[in-house]
């Protein structure tokens, strides 16, 4: 018995070619143009999909860490603000979706908390 599923119309499983996912995560630093460059690199490398990460900072940053000052791409700011700046909103993900469709690559995001599951749903 062959075991396979379809992801975005691509069969994955026994006897199927390897399905390659490029992990973008939060390496875009909250910058859509950088996210698009990372998508382009994944396309150029022959990846089937790109994966982002979605978090609700208030749910994922422990209270004792929120006000700690960190060095960030935006200078010295507290950790909660840093985490907020990394997140894309609904409009941003819409743009990512459109861009991935034009680039013929599947995209999805892993959620880190219940609110992010609802957001992505």
Which residues does each predicted region cover?
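Active-site-adjacent beta->alpha loops and helix N-cap segments on the catalytic face
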Residues: 3, 31-32, 60-65, 89-93, ...
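Hydrophobic faces of well-ordered beta-strands that scaffold small-molecule active sites
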Residues: 20-24, 50-52, 107-110
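Active-site beta-loop-alpha junctions enriched in small/polar residues
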Residues: 25-27, 53-57, 112-114
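Glycine-rich anion/phosphate-binding loops
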Residues: 27-45, 90-91
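Active-site beta->alpha loop and helix N-cap motifs at the rims of alpha/beta catalytic domains
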Residues: 73-121
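Conserved, mostly hydrophobic/aromatic
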Residues: 23, 42, 120
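Glycine-rich, proline-tolerant flexible connector loops at the mouths of alpha/beta enzymes
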Residues: 48-87
């Amino acid at each position: 018995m062959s075991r396979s599923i379809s992801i975005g119309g691509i069969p994955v499983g026994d006897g199927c070619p390897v399905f390659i996912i490029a992990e973008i995560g939060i390496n875009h630093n909250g910058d859509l143009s950088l996210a698009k460059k990372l998508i382009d690199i994944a396309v150029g490398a022959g990846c089937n999909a790109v994966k982002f990460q979605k978090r609700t900072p208030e749910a994922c940053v422990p209270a004792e860490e929120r006000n700690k000052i960190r060095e960030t791409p935006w200078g010295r700011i507290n950790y909660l603000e840093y985490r907020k700046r990394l997140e894309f909103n609904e409009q941003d993900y819409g743009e990512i979706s459109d861009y991935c469709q034009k680039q013929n690559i599947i995209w999805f995001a892993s959620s880190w908390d219940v609110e992010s599951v609802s957001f992505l749903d």
